[in-house]
Amino acid sequence: MKRTIETILTATESYLPGDLIVYRALPRRELRRVGGFVFLDHFDQTDVTPELFDVPPHPHVGLQTVTYLFEGEAFHTDSLDNEQAGEVNWMTAGRGITHAEQVTKTQPRMHGLQSWVGLPHDKRKVEPAFDNFPAAVLPMLEIDGASITVIAGELHGNISPIPTYQELSYFDVVINEGASVDLTIHPEHELAIYVADGSIEISGTQIKLHDLAKLTAGDELSFTATENARFVILGGEPLPDPTVIYWNFVTDTVGEAKQAAIDWQDGEFPPVNKYRKFTSEDLGEEADRTQLL
């Protein structure tokens, strides 16, 4: 059965600390989550300075954060003393972690997504962890005028090396104008499409830049590019209830989430010892980042 569009929601403009513009697609009042995905921010800005992209230390519980960059480089530090610049940053908060994300030098273009994946009930208090993956290790398919990168999960027999705690589908699609593609995706997975560039059509309905399209159930997905486009397909097996999404936390109860917020306010979360402020003056064009740490 072919998947069709159930609803289309346009991402809302917001700002990160430092005034970087982001387009927030999840969560929405009308759509709280898609599979395990409970949060999705899209950013696309030029001349991004260290002052503009500086998300200071903040806590997470019960989820995984996924930073996936189409272009540019983000610098991650956390309370496990990880410090890593890279294209795919996959952090497991589990029972609790503190982290920060920055740029250490001006980026000509910073374009990418940050998503959060809520952990299943029995994994929400696992030990925190962090993994970084270069984009080159992710499988890529060439299908009928489209290049598809398997960020997480499996597509047409191609399996991502990124380990997850539940079944996910997370695919980055770059497609040429006029190309049409048919995919077979796990029928039990909830799915949505978010358009990061250009526009596409599904069954004659257009999905434009900054649109999040929730899809109906099915095992086949067909789409056509009305112009050169880039979008992600995301989702997976549904998160079981009760699932509470509160500030930066995914928990079983509201009480647990509120306690996590109190713990943060009371300084109970571990610090990010390697976090520091970067400024444009810190770096010349050829500066070595390691000299700043």
Per-segment meaning from a language model:
Residues 1-293:
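Jelly-roll (double-stranded beta-helix
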